[in-house]
């Protein structure tokens, strides 16, 4: 039976979470949803920094790396959702936006992949 897209996504989000755990990150939440604003694949803590992670998977790089599919629109949604999360949870720590790109058996972790300063809300 063919794997559903949501099952494939969850599998690779878990793979990304395990990857971060191996780097000593503490996973705070996975699949955080704030409707209708957006969702965040992984919220983690790296030392004293709260990290909001977008996970992208592609079978091949024929049309670009998975990270290249994190559009400006998606970045904006992740940032808005993260800022709401920070406010709701009264977080005073530094925050960062990372992307984990998964293609075949290769994982690429891009720290500071995008930042809120580039957007006007």
Predicted features along the sequence, with ranges:
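Active-site metal-binding core of divalent-cation-utilizing nuclease and nuclease-like domains
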Residues: 23-50
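Acidic-basic catalytic patches of nuclease active cores, encompassing PD-(D/E)XK
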Residues: 1-30
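Conserved catalytic cores of phosphodiester-cleaving nucleases, focusing on short active-site segments
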Residues: 40-61, 78
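Mg2+/Mn2+-dependent nuclease catalytic core
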Residues: 59-79, 84
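Acidic active-site catalytic centers that drive phospho-/nucleotidyl reactions
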Residues: 13, 39-41, 54, 74, ...
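Domain-level recognition of nuclease-like catalytic cores that cleave nucleotide substrates
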Residues: 88-121
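Short, glycine/acidic-enriched loop or turn micro-motifs at the edges of active sites
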Residues: 32-34, 57, 101
């Amino acid at each position: 039976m063919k794997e559903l897209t949501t099952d494939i996504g969850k599998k690779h989000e878990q793979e990304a979470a395990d990857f971060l755990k191996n780097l000593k990150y503490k996973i705070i939440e996975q699949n955080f949803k704030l409707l209708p604003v957006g969702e965040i694949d992984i919220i983690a803590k790296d030392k004293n920094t709260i990290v909001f992670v977008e996970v992208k998977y592609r079978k091949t790089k024929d049309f670009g790396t998975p990270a290249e599919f994190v559009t400006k629109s998606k970045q904006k949604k992740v940032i808005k959702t993260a800022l709401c999360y920070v406010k709701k949870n009264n977080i005073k720590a530094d925050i960062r936006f990372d992307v984990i790109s998964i293609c075949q058996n290769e994982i690429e972790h891009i720290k500071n992949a995008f930042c809120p300063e580039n957007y006007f809300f």
